[in-house]
Amino acid sequence: MSQWQFKLFEFDIREELETDKNEFIPGRDTKRFIIQMYGIDENGKTACIFVKGFNPFFYVKVLDEWDNSKVTEFVAFVRKEMGAYFGDSLVSAKIVYRHKFYEFDNKKLYKFVQLKFTSIGAFNKCKNLWYNETKYGEDRKLKENGLEFLDTKTTLYEAQVPPLLRLFHIRQIKPSGWVALKNGHYSQNRKQLTTCDYEFTVNYKNIYPINDERLEKICVPFKILSLDIEASSSHGDFPLARKNYLKLATNIVDYLINNNIETCDKDLLSNLIKTGFSYRINKDIEKIYLKKSITEEELDELIDNLVDIKPGKKENYIDIKDEDENSDSSDIENDGIVEEFTTKKRQKVTGTKNKDSNILEIINDLTCNRNTRILELAKCFGQHNPNRDNKWEGKFPELEGDQVTIIGSTIRRNGEDKPYLQHAIVVNDCNSIDNVVIESYKTERDALLAWTNFVQRENPDIIIGYNHHGWDEGFMYDRSIELNCMTQFSKLSRFKNEKCIKEIFQGKNKPKKITIEESSTKLASGQFDLRYFKMSGRLQIDFLNLFRREEQLPSYKLDYVAGHFIGDNIKKIEYDENCSILYSKNLTGLSKNDYIVIQEIGYSTDQYANGKKFKVLDIVDDKIILNDKITPDTNKILRWCLGKDDVGPQDIFRLTNEGPEGRAIVTKYCIKDCDLVQDLMRKNDTMTSYDEMSNLCWVPKSFLVTRGQGIKLTSYVAQKCREKNTLMPVIDKGIDGEGYEGAIVLEPKCNLYLKKPVACVDYSSLYPSSIISENISHDSKVWTKEYDLDDNLINETGEKDENGKFIYDELPEYDYIDITYDTFKWIRKTPKAAATKVKSGYKTCRYVQFQNNEKAILPSILDELLGARKSTKRQMKNETDPFMQNVLDKRQLSIKITANSLYGQAGAKTSTFYDKDIAASTTATGRKLLIYAKELIEACYDNTIEETTNYGEVKCYGEYIYGDSVASYTPIYVRYNKSIIDICSVEELAEKYGNGWHLESPKEYCELNNIESWTENGWTECHRVIRHRLAPYKKMVRILTHTGLVDVTDDHSLVKNTGEEISPKDVSIGTKLLHCTMSENESNIESDISIDEARIMGFFFGDGSCGIYDCPSGHKASWALNNSNKELIEKYYNLCKSVYPEFEWKVYDTLNSSGVYKICFNKKSGSKSKIQFIEKYRSMLYNKKSKIIPSEIINGSIELRKSFWEGLYDADGDKDKNGYTRIDQKSQISAAYICWLANSIGYKTSLNIRDDKTDIYRITATKNKQRRDGDKIKKIVNIQNSANIQNSANIQNSVNIQNSVNIQNSKDNQDYVYDLTTENHHHFAAGIGNMIVHNTDSVFFTFNLKDLDSKEIVGKKALEITIELAKKAGWLATMFLKSPHDLEYEKTFLPFCLLSKKRYVGILYEEDPNKGKRKEMGLVLKRRDNCAQVKDVYGGAIDILMKDQVVHKAVDFVKHSLQDVIDEKISQQKLIITKSLRSYYKNPKQIAHNVLAIRIGERDPGNKPKPGDRMEFIYIKNSDKKALQGDRIETPLFINENNIEIDYGFYITNQIMKPLQQLFALVLEDMEDFVTKRGISMKSWKAEIDKLHEKWTEPDKFSKKYEELRCKEVKSILFDPYIKLLK
């Protein structure tokens, strides 16, 4: 052929000897690194390509001063450190210049030395020089100063990248792509070392990738072998290839416990042991099977020796299975092999009080737990030594293990539907089976070797199975050792005569451990141990392991998985005589003569005809023809699924021993399982998925199968670093106990939304886009600064110059952004307590922003990925070839998974590019964006008129669910018409500057015109003021810093000095909040007020009064200045005469009666009215009852303001001991004016409140430096609103809370709280002083639609409009975001029931308002440990609420259902609960279904449930009130046979009640029985809520108790009547 082309699929690393004769030279490393590439051409011919000439290498960072001579010295030093054996294998060292991956350095190039090696052994030996020496099994740590050479630190780079992957990167070879050999630059091997069709040797520079669209469309015909074995079981339990005495020890100890035998003497122990050896009879002791029988006399001698053994003298270890008895294995199941997929726990056998105790003393020591007694006894018999090839060590004879009986294999070519060969190797005779090739052998040994020959003969490319890595291959390997044929059996590789085993070095003077590949897979469900053969040239895929990683399934049993994937909905059913014709869409995996089960899916899933399996007569197009006439319930969703053969473990063991006919049944079952795995592989198109992920991340498919996602991301990042001339350092695993705030989950507003559609928008690729938009990357991070909770700088990173200035900060050619996140530590309160996550401070990271849209490495990677995914999805739309459509779909999915994994991997401590700051900065940006989206949408659709496509203009009232920020009397600083500054209460804004309140509902809005609010960014446009009544459960708190005071609700209303929002619940004494001193008015408006009049007005503000009022003697008016200082009174008396000469002024001595002198006036004849003068003062210096500073002075000259201040000080000021000016006020408005005035004339102010009189506000002013940090909180005070709030809320730790404040609000607005919306993220200055506050956010948004006549729009019309507006809202939000952020419309719910985080149900609509489907998450409908009746009742209630939207109708349905339970109208099938039986429990008597299993074994030994069996049971009545759970359940069959009463009450109180309580608690106030009970006024209900507040003052605890109270109320009105009937 003109050019050899192959698609790669598997790789192996080998080393050959250097010399021509391939001779081993003692004392010298003569091996050379070789890569074996296995490929296949389009005709199915395989090739092994030996790639030579590539030397593994890594880099060492050195000083810039190094030259070639220094490198030469360094190489000599390293060779010496490597030792004589490996030293000469370091063959190359050269200086290169590269960028480094961590920290921004303005693209500086650093000096590195590249070290190359001839062998992987030398590569590792040299790499280890940078690590500290560790004991075997310990994690290695890098040396703190690297490898020191001549007092110089050298740092290791890129040694974490496997040389195989390095070759891919250099040669641009995709590991699952096509390659070609350069003509004339390769040799074809005549004498082949492998069993491939072709074999080549080529230099790595002469193999290159092919990017050919024609080849990409070829489905290469891989030969795929599916494996499954069956084995015998001597005890009827799970087969064990090698057995010890643990089973006998367990039987003995349990016998003693169950029979309450406290003292076991030698005779009893001897009899129990002899029972196991069949010399005695005892039904509780199972027989053991020996490899070689012994006489009773020989056994007596062994027992005599055993009772004298003192096991505590030696440390001894034994593998046991450890499972949490409180967990339910219903979520984690296996194909009859539960035992092999439990987490192994290596236990040191301890627990005896005396190490000198013999085994009898240990057995009788009741202080020892059951496990210790069993394990101590078991080790006295003997055990296999794992460090000596599992050799048996012990006095007692070795036991016979269970045997392989059948090895099934089916082989299919990739792209074909069915296997072309079905093959079985059977021990002993077996009847023939249609289309199955059967080989029978007399011995197990011959059968094992026959399978090796079969593999070599058929030569598959891929071997698949279902848990064959967890059990089948390991079991066969162990049996081959037992049968002394391991060497021959293990020759399964494509490399001729290669044994697929490995030798593990265990230390000097210790024998090497011989084993097969062993690894562990850690998943959420536990750690799973894998053992399998590494077969060179054959890719292996274990589908159980694959599905555990990638699919969330209720069960992983093969029959369930097959039914889950191989099945589809039934569209319709037709009949032809006695046959049924089922129409369905996807029939992949189903064949003629298969069996299917019909499912009826409602709230629970019922098996039609009790799960009967129907034979498939034929398949025609999209039609399944059955041999029966079926009539399922067509009102439910109907689904067919593959029905796996019903052959249980016990049946397999029995049939195998029943002769050729029985073995044929088991063999057929075995072959069917092989076929099922083939079907699953084809249905899921596993090869295409692996191809795409492999090529994307530059890793072989085998890496994806056997290794975690870390290696694929390491490869991907390393390849991208290579493109940017950048090197990754080798780093240690993260070990600190610190953390950061993870991805945000917004607090839900739990409720039942029946009439208003609830829209949902979502960011497209939120976290990858956050990295791109903010340029978050290792190489863009300039510095970090970490602070504790007291704002003390505790750590910083980043390169500084000799003056301590960051070198790469504030460079003129770059912009920078800061991202702040909270830091946490895991702390144990006591040494034995569980560690809890506690906030420890915060950290700010600065990232550089490059010019011209250039990106750092991580953002550029993600930018490329997101772009590639969009491009791939566009290709999919235009592609017509189904094969390529599927390829492209798998490709875009691989891209999505990789992009979403990158930021998480950066935060994983085991990652090769770990950097907590990257992950934390990403989630912090994500939180910020989510909050932005909510605020923008709510603000932009608040009281607006929107144009819609089909309904014209509609009114929008985007629902604000802001945290009710401030009290009605709170001072607000505003500016009108960009010129006039005003200070007024927040409730006055609408009156003074608004156009009236709108939307008379729980929330009211008032648009503001030409108003700005003061913020940290200066004057910012203020759009509207919002108010609503304070809910009874809401709490208010006063926050006092040294320079600010504000009364707020306990929602997110404050802002930290870093700009981050914070709730009053989370602050404490010392927390720094955001403040910003208001600037003086630059407009300086002209005024008629003179300097002297301003002083009089200041004095009046401090101690003056005036008013017009009616009294019994008639209409009166008064005006007075008051003071006890005679000299001051004389001074202001003369000032008044001068400023107001039109009046007659007098001084009255009221010192004895009032304690002051008074200055008053009378009208002169012909002068202006006294009342006019008083009205002027009232209008200028009063706001209702509070004194204010006239606008003319606030906005006037500094001379006017200073004069007013002097008058104020004369009247009401004094000096403290430090000489500071001090003024007290009773009004927040007045105090706010004084603070502003003082600041405007150059004073610094501080605030305080008195402990005895908390409504007195003290302002202290000075022009000196203030002693304390003005931004820190110094007091947190509860507020009692006499109009509404009766209880005191504990917002913070009680040591930080002062006494409560009693606030009297204005009568009209006594229970309102207020918020502002501004352009500055809703920040605004509020309260006394300089504090900036913030309002909060909602979880969902609804548009509260109305037509132009203000009539509410609901139902389908509202749904259609909501979908349209939600799309516009997403587009609007995206307009103001950095690229590539895109806020996309996702879905709309109507109705919607939100129970809690990630627990909801609703009718989901996407684009079409006519196409809705029920969507649910986290509900009991999904849980498998609930009986079907729970799902039916709960689902029925949900259905009524969703469809009919009538609460009382749902209540009636539940009542009717409860009555049916009491009346025993419910079928037993609806009450059955199922759980899987495990092989081991710590406390077996506490596991109900395990107790039932024991009970079944006692009454029917032949049918005792075994580990892996799924037990069905129903709760029954038991007259003993102290009966444990195990005595309160029974099997349905036993209940019927013995007329046992079912405990229906249990199902109401323990199964049905709790989920329905949570559901109806959401609509409690809409339940008619609740209104009847509590009355329309709900006074008693509100009183209970108040009591709850008093008892549970912490918000989180209150919320929990409040929910419990609501659930309790539901129980009392809905369930208690029926519970009483049961009693």
Swiss-Prot record:
Broad EC category: transferase
The EC number(s) this enzyme carries: 2.7.7.7
BP GO terms, sorted: base-excision repair, gap-filling; DNA replication proofreading; intein-mediated protein splicing; nucleotide-excision repair, DNA gap filling; viral DNA genome replication
Sorted UniProt keywords: Autocatalytic cleavage, DNA replication, DNA-binding, DNA-directed DNA polymerase, Nucleotidyltransferase, Protein splicing, Repeat, Transferase, Viral DNA replication
Top-rank lineage group of the source organism: Viruses
Processing and modification events after translation: This protein undergoes a protein self splicing that involves a post-translational excision of the intervening region (intein) followed by peptide ligation.
Catalytic activity: DNA(n) + a 2'-deoxyribonucleoside 5'-triphosphate = DNA(n+1) + diphosphate
GO MF term set: 3'-5'-DNA exonuclease activity; DNA binding; DNA-directed DNA polymerase activity; endonuclease activity; nucleotide binding
PROSITE patterns reported for this sequence: INTEIN_C_TER, INTEIN_ENDONUCLEASE
Pfam family, one: DNA_pol_B
Record-linked PANTHER family: DNA POLYMERASE CATALYTIC SUBUNIT, DNA POLYMERASE DELTA CATALYTIC SUBUNIT
Family label: Belongs to the DNA polymerase type-B family.
Name of the featured protein: DNA polymerase
Organism: Chrysochromulina ericina virus
Protein's gene: dpo
